[in-house]
């Protein structure tokens, strides 16, 4: 552009050699006043004559949109003009059109309903757009209402964006129309759920912002199909601590009788298994119960707690060999008051008891039920006999039988004479 202006200035000044050659300044070249005819000098008019054929004052079309139009500089009749407020120049001075609006027109025929932007300097009248008619709320189901409701926008949206939102809502309504038709066809079929149909009939006349269709669900029993060849496992019933295995016959269903027992079904009582635990026995005293088992001459856990302590004491005193011999040979048993007595002493006591019982047995005298006393018995005068000392506090069973009556005096004299002769 600067080269064209310099050429034009050189051609104008070529006729007069005496005149000075003046080149346009950068501000003159860049300012819009020179293009629109605001300056009156010759250079400005030359620049205007060169640039005006390309950009006219009546309609200036953007070069990028000229390709869409079929080579025509004016827009088609179907497109609406896009008006912009006047722009003030930076150098000082306004456009040649004055306070009128500029005639920049978008040549794109596809954009027909663009929103108009409001200007703070000039009031622009916004033409009311016709809103699409919506079907009545009673004919729509709750599901279609949820689909048809546009996205809620905050109330702080400016007036300039309101036509755009209406346009979007209109497009959204047009796109959702086939979905409404499908849902209305589905509602016409008898397979529709009763809850959705009932809610659609009871809806109020005014549309609600968001309504969701609810459906009630009820628990139903679940049946598992088992293969026909495999019978179900027989149930097991516990009765009085025993496990009862029920044997079912093929082709019959299980029945429940009184107290949970199946009637007329053969069953066998399975008794619990008894585990025989190995019981330890002390090698010295023979007991089976002890707080702790100890090591003995024949290995671990062979002596009870008391016998094990006694064996350990003998090992320290006499050695292992003598301790083992005394522990194994001199066995003990439980005596009186829970005390332990060696087997040798116990056998001696038992033999003495048996001898005393044999010696204490008497023979009847003179046809009376009297007992014959041992030889140590000596009768005294007066007819009362004294008993020999008894061991271990033992007394005869029949004490009254020990009283011997004195024989008649004739028999006493005969016995004394017989003793003197001998």
UniProtKB/Swiss-Prot annotation:
GO terms for molecular function: DNA-binding transcription activator activity; sequence-specific DNA binding; transcription cis-regulatory region binding; zinc ion binding. PROSITE patterns: GATA_ZN_FINGER_2 (PS50114). The lineage of its organism: Eukaryota, Fungi, Dikarya, Ascomycota, Saccharomycotina. This is Biofilm regulator 1. Keywords: Cell adhesion, Metal-binding, Nucleus, Transcription, Transcription regulation, Virulence, Zinc, Zinc-finger. It is found in: Nucleus. InterPro entries: Znf_GATA, Znf_NHR/GATA. Disruption phenotype: Attenuates virulence in a mouse model of systemic infection. Induction: Up-regulation during the yeast-to-hypha transition is dependent upon the function of YAK1. HOG1 represses the expression of BRG1 via the transcriptional repressor SKO1. Regulated by TYE7 during late-stage biofilm formation. GO terms for biological process: cell adhesion; cellular response to starvation; filamentous growth; filamentous growth of a population of unicellular organisms; filamentous growth of a population of unicellular organisms in response to biotic stimulus; filamentous growth of a population of unicellular organisms in response to starvation; positive regulation of filamentous growth of a population of unicellular organisms; positive regulation of filamentous growth of a population of unicellular organisms in response to biotic stimulus. Residues 1-86, 116-207 are annotated as: Disordered. It holds the Pfam family GATA.
